[in-house]
């Protein structure tokens, strides 16, 4: 198999046109090609009058591929990625805390190794969790144990199911292939910006859970980690809380994949004197535009083409005050969702289903902050800042989980909104007109305002006065890092404890978290064979 990059294909390409383009680039006859398959595909929309797919194609030839590869640029012999699944040795079963991407993939790899892992999750299974979330979005009745942050699949379950990642780790291919084998669409294997969609992601998560159980693993929902026991700096046991009371599980290996919103667990770890440090993260709001306007701005006359789907964007700018402002977790044809998980505190996120065909498109508009901005040097100071702003958002929304919203024009002019334009907020249970400038510290609100203006020059209409801001977006990443060793991935203090994934500060998104879960599982398997 030969891999050919930099192949330009029209939006209506078919197998015949792919073969023709590959033959031309390889300078061979079409009949020398046995088969072709898209390996990677992205949209090149830099010229609005000539939008095309930029692709990498795997081609099987019936002539000597090595010779062809040597004489042509942008080619290489394609090597199929094969994951080496190790077997578990003679050791007690491990426990994984948290059933987000990191925890699920750690449990899957451990189950396949024969480790019979226990996976505990403080929230509910994805079906009951979905019912709880939908009830909250319609009635405003929050369940602090089952919500957008807690439950099977983690916080990413109620997002766009975005699978793009900055990590170059080869295991990311493994993650994508596992998603497909458990029910995700094949296109995530080749799209440069793959996504599953919230609707499809739920079924995929259940299928992963079922395989873990079939292989001898145990999955416990509504089960919360409340304490751990150590001896001679080694993990000996954990205490869990269930509906039947507390229970002690003796184990010497625990993967701590708790997610970025397990604040009570962060406090428990701090009380146990585990080394934790405050880390930089970002705060801002969701910004919502009409999908058709974003599509037009990105795709010009090609807007609405079903091959392109709803348009994406990713913007960032550096301000004179030294801060970075950027968009994050863009949800084309999606909705803004109420992602609250604590009583009397409110935060937001974005979500799309696979079709991405809702009326609006949205993204997080975030300002980078660092520990120098926090109100103290406490390791959990970033978390306390999150809580403070979420409490102010809750009050601004009317103290009933309605979200505070504001038109961009009003935000830029520091006045409370009193009416809507052509963009209707999509968040539930409802919204309240507000002035977000009164929620954020000045350094955040002024940076957001400057960012909106500068990004309006990058993407036509981004600074539309009728665009809607919904606050606050405070959970884009973890505010802490649980310190671990670079070689064993264990806590720098406690042997057998593996801080893992986004909540521990070692990932940012579904793919990188899943990869980190796999890496932690591998370390436990390696140790079991010593």
Which role fits each region the language model picked out?
Residues 1-53, 57-158, 162-530:
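Residues forming the flavin
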């Amino acid at each position: 198999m030969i891999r050919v990059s930099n192949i330009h294909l029209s939006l209506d390409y078919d197998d015949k046109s792919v073969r023709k383009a590959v033959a031309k680039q390889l300078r061979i006859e079409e009949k020398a090609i046995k088969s072709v398959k898209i390996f990677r595909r992205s949209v090149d929309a830099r010229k609005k009058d000539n939008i095309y797919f930029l692709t990498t194609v795997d081609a099987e030839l019936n002539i000597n591929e090595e010779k062809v590869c040597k004489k042509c640029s942008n080619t290489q012999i394609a090597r199929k990625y094969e994951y080496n699944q190790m077997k578990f040795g003679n050791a007690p079963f491990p426990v994984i805390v948290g059933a987000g991407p990191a925890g699920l993939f750690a449990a899957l790899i451990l189950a396949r190794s024969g480790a019979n892992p226990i996976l505990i999750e403080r929230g509910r299974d994805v079906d009951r969790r979905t019912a709880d979330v939908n009830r909250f979005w319609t009635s405003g009745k929050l369940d602090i144990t089952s919500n957008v942050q807690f439950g099977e699949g983690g916080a990413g379950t109620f997002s766009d199911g975005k699978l793009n990642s900055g990590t170059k780790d080869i295991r990311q291919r493994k993650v994508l292939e596992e998603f497909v084998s458990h029910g995700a669409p094949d296109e995530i294997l080749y799209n440069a910006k793959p996504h599953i969609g919230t609707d499809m992601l739920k079924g995929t998560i259940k299928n992963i859970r079922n395989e873990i159980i079939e292989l001898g693993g145990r999955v416990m929902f509504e089960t919360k980690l409340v304490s751990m026991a150590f001896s001679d700096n080694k993990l000996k046991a954990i205490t869990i809380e269930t509906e039947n009371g507390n229970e002690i599980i003796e184990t010497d290996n625990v993967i701590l994949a708790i997610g970025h919103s397990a604040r009570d667990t962060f406090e428990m770890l701090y009380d146990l004197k585990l080394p934790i440090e405050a880390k930089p993260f970002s705060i801002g709001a969701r910004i919502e535009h009409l999908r058709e306007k974003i599509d037009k701005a990105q795709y010009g006359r090609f807007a609405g083409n079903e091959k392109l789907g709803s348009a994406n964007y990713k913007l960032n700018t550096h301000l004179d005050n030294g801060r970075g402002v950027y968009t994050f977790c863009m949800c084309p044809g999606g909705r803004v969702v109420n992602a609250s998980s604590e009583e009397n505190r409110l935060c937001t996120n974005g979500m799309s289903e696979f079709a991405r065909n809702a009326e609006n498109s949205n993204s997080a508009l975030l300002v980078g902050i660092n520990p120098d901005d926090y109100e103290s040097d406490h390791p959990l100071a970033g978390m306390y800042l999150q809580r403070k702003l979420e409490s102010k958002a809750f009050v601004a929304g009317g103290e009933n989980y309605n979200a505070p919203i504001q038109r961009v024009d009003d935000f830029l002019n520091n006045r409370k909104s009193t009416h809507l334009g052509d963009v209707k907020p999509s968040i539930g249970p409802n919204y309240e007109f507000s002035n977000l400038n009164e929620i954020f510290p000045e350094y955040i609100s002024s940076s957001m305002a400057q960012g909106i203006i500068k990004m309006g020059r990058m993407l036509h209409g981004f600074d539309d006065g009728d665009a809607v801001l919904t606050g606050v977006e405070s959970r884009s990443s973890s505010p802490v890092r649980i310190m671990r060793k670079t070689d064993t991935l264990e806590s720098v203090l406690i042997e057998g404890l593996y801080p893992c994934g986004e909540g521990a500060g070692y990932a940012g998104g579904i793919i990188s978290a899943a990869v980190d879960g796999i890496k932690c599982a591998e370390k436990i398997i390696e140790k079991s064979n010593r």
